[in-house]
Amino acid sequence: DFDCPPDWSAYDXQCYYAF
């Protein structure tokens, strides 16, 4: 698990924002 904002998705150790 990654510490990302609720609206973000964690993938490959990074956080991506769902546009």
From Swiss-Prot:
Principal location class: secreted
Start and end residues of each C-type lectin domain: 11-19
Tissue: Expressed by the venom gland.
GO MF annotation: an example: metal ion binding
Post-translational modification, as annotated: N-glycosylated.
Cysteines paired by S-S bonds: C4-C15
GO cellular component: extracellular region
Subunit structure: Heterotrimer; disulfide-linked. The heterotrimer consists of 1 heavy chain (a metalloproteinase) and 2 light chains: LC1 and LC2.
Misc note: Calcium is required for ligand binding.
Protein name: Snaclec factor X-activator 2 light chain 1
